[in-house]
Amino acid sequence: MSKGECPMRTANVAGGGTKIKDWWPNELPVSVLRQHDPRQNPLTSDFNYAEEFKKLDYNALKKDLTALMTDSQDWWPADFGHYGGLFVRMAWHSAGTYRVTDGRGGGGDGQQRFAPLNAWPDNVSLDKARRLLWPIKQKYGNKISWADLMLLTGNVALESMGCETFGFAGGRPDTFQSDESIYWGGEDTWLGNDVRYSNGNKGVSGEGVVDGDQHKMDHKDIHSRDLEQPVAAAHMGLIYVNPEGPDGVPDPIAAARDIRTTFHRMAMNDEETAALIIGGHSFGKTHGAAPSENTGPDPNSEDLSTQGFGWINKHGSGKGPDTITSGLEVTWTGTPTKWSNKYLEYLYKYEWELEKSPAGANQWVAKTEDHIIPDAYDANKKHKPRMLTTDMSMRMDPGFEKITRRWLDHPQELHDAFIRAWFKLLHRDMGPRSRWVGPEIPKEVLLWEDPVPEVDHALVEESDISALKKQILEAGIEPSKLIRTAWASAASYRGSDKRGGANGARIRLAPQKDWEVNNPKELAEVLKALEGVQSKFNGSASGGKKISLADLIVLAGTAAVEKAAGVSVPFTPGRTDATEEQTDAKSFEHLEPATDPFRNYGKSSDRARTEQLDLDKASLLRLTAPELTVLVGGMRALNANWDSSSHGIFTKRPGQLTNDFFVNLLDINTEWKAADSSKLPELYEGFDRKSGQKKWTGTRHDLVYGSHPELRAIAEVYAQPDNSDKFVKDFVKAWDKVMSNDRFDLKAKSS
């Protein structure tokens, strides 16, 4: 059967046909909470990647990667006889999808292998880069993940071209499916930005779309638009910005605006941004030998016979000098396989004028007769210097110009800035150092790592823990407040980039101490009481034992849950307290939740309903649908609403860990009606069907568990009397999971 002959919609097997999403486009996608099912992983459940990595002959692997750089293959020959530029781009485009807003993207899961990233126009030809690596991946097997290998290869590529790097940490276990929790944008055409910008443009339809195709479209204002959150790319299918300029318009000043927006959302400042662009563009070349009409479909749209390759090129040989990747044809320096300062030397030495690439894309050529740029395949050919519109931004934008002129005269400063920014690019989503493995971890600890101090004292033992629980409960603080505080501390965790969590006790620092959801006045009261308990214990404990406030906050919540449930709740000490100097307060602002379903906080935005935001929060906490459900029900029973309101507290015995929330929500004798939306937005009232008496009030956070079929099915399990003990057991297990999400020092495997 030929490609395109049998669309999935018409297939009558294997999940084909009209789907639930086709009938109900707004259906809550609970399936995103099933993504991390271990059954999707072909490796055994006890596989420990961090331990496997430690068995790796790291130096031998790097030696093999270095040899690969100059082992040009006939089926995909290396530019200038060196694959360095290709592999730098592969690593950059793997890590560069990270965005600080929600911590998603990045290279930590090796997602470049899967849709949609493997088919993005910005990733044309990276299918070949990964295939070149397969023999090495096959050789070293489970000791090196694809996620680590793609990034390490970029590091080795730099080193092989004379650019000393800052270091490298392994420890990224592979995933084996596309991450469908990520919002990459709402556009339905490649290079489109008509959703992410209110005045954006439709993209390009058809097969074989490449970066340099947007100049073919009509354009709107590119100077004053605002990029929607949480995306960090100016176009669908690009990592950052359009190399031709915004929407294909070759305007370096407007391009600088887009560059700042996208790189800042990747947690890079202006200096780091400039260093990455200059450093990355010091190597290799772009490819635009002919118009994109010569290229075939992306890998996901191709025939089985191509075996994962896409963008088959009909121009000439389809490779080497005939390659079409971006549609632009630029080699930045005269030393494309060697680190140098020639990028900046050329940028400022020459004046530049617009030209069209052989593919018709906008690019810049030096106003000179100097032919000093080597040809990638013909040693007898030389070319004029050329640049991209985004390169022109490094000179023409006043802010970037100030930075880059300094580096022109001080190249060592550029090198230091580049290798630090490159290291940050590759490791920003790795989380704490307790996840890092390998012999090249730098000794210098960087602020963006969100460091916490090492444990430098003896930890509390069981007898101490019991005594501390007693002191906490006798300190005069309501148990519900202790539970809310512990939850607030731990639930800041993001499984996407492994930031946040209880370790560090940053809930006592700005900005977390001032977040509305954390009820600052109540939080200050609880922290003051716990600091008193801490001071008393640390001042009198024997054997050098101490307890951190981070541990005490979690222990306080644990003690309160135990009191409410009458069961034992796990607790493992070992957290430490971060200082203000170890905390980038501005960076932590991105962790503030839009909603918290567990504390009944927040409401719909103009783009997402409350329950969709709740699902996103649960996904970041790496919860399953049953865990989400049992935690919400338990927190309501424990009277843990952020503002102490009664909404969703469907029980006559608040403060006891019961399944009353589910029993009363699903009571068939209760009729729910929306309250007056002008006074009480997103509030619902539950009335007795016979008497008409109002019994309860609830929010969308609450009622979704009776409305959504899958969530209701789970809620019904917990509403049954024969599952009341199961409810308590499951709540305690899920509670402990959230409290320990960031305890990578305890986990059997890094995940």
UniProtKB/Swiss-Prot annotation:
Coiled coil: none
GO molecular-function terms, A-Z: catalase activity; heme binding; metal ion binding
Crosslinked positions (Tryptophyl-tyrosyl-methioninium (Tyr-Met) (with W-92)): Y240-M266
Transmembrane segments: none
EC code(s) of this entry: 1.11.1.21
Major enzyme class: oxidoreductase
UniProt key word Iron: yes
Chain sites annotated for binding heme b: H281
Swiss-Prot/TrEMBL cofactor(s): heme b
Gene3D superfamilies membership: 1.10.520.10, Peroxidase, domain 2
Active site as annotated: H93
Keyword annotations from UniProtKB, A to Z: Cytoplasm, Heme, Hydrogen peroxide, Iron, Metal-binding, Oxidoreductase, Peroxidase
Location of the protein in the cell: Cytoplasm
Site residues by UniProt (Transition state stabilizer): R89
Catalytic activity: H2O2 + AH2 = A + 2 H2O; 2 H2O2 = O2 + 2 H2O
Annotated crosslink Tryptophyl-tyrosyl-methioninium (Trp-Tyr) (with M-266) location: W92-Y240
Biological process (GO), any one: cellular response to hydrogen peroxide
Sequence similarity: Belongs to the peroxidase family. Peroxidase/catalase subfamily.
HAMAP family in UniProt: Catal_peroxid
Function: Bifunctional enzyme with both catalase and broad-spectrum peroxidase activity.
Assembly: Homodimer or homotetramer.
Protein name, per record: Catalase-peroxidase
Source species: Phaeosphaeria nodorum (strain SN15 / ATCC MYA-4574 / FGSC 10173)
